[in-house]
């Protein structure tokens, strides 16, 4: 199945603690159905000291379920994603709300 949300997409959080916030996807894990979004779903982790790394409490992004994020359209609102096959046979993603191409 083609990916509706990809690395580099600007997305908005639809539910949860960060509802309404936007960020850029920097990693997608399709098998787990989750994505990592820069600046969203920040958690604190206690890091044990190693020879190469200092110990302490670090903040990092936790995965967020793909069902809880949506691509932000050109109008700044979240939109669902569909697919369209162009005349030359190329498959592109389109915004369901406006019909505009997302990439291509």
Curated annotation (Swiss-Prot):
One of its GO terms (molecular function) is rRNA binding. Keywords: Ribonucleoprotein, Ribosomal protein, RNA-binding, rRNA-binding. GO terms for biological process: translation. Pfam families: KOW (PF00467), ribosomal_L24 (PF17136). PROSITE patterns: RIBOSOMAL_L24. The keyword rRNA-binding applies. InterPro entries: KOW (IPR005824), Rib_uL2_dom2 (IPR014722), Ribosomal_uL24 (IPR003256), Ribosomal_uL24_CS (IPR005825), Ribosomal_uL24_KOW (IPR041988), Translation_prot_SH3-like_sf (IPR008991). It comes from the Bacteria. SMART domains: KOW (SM00739). GO terms for cellular component: ribonucleoprotein complex; ribosome. Gene3D superfamilies: 2.30.30.30. Belongs to the universal ribosomal protein uL24 family. Part of the 50S ribosomal subunit. One of two assembly initiator proteins, it binds directly to the 5'-end of the 23S rRNA, where it nucleates assembly of the 50S subunit. This is Large ribosomal subunit protein uL24.
């Amino acid at each position: 199945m083609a990916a509706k949300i990809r690395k580099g997409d600007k997305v908005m959080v639809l539910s949860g603690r960060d509802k309404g916030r936007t960020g850029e996807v920097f990693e997608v894990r399709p098998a787990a159905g989750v994505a990592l979004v820069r600046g969203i779903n920040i958690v604190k982790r206690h890091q044990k000291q190693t020879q190469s790394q200092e110990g302490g409490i670090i903040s990092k992004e936790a995965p967020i379920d793909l069902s809880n994020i949506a691509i932000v359209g050109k109008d700044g609102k979240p939109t669902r994603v569909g697919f369209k096959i162009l005349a030359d046979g190329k498959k592109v993603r389109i915004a369901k709300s406006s019909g505009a191409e997302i990439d291509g």
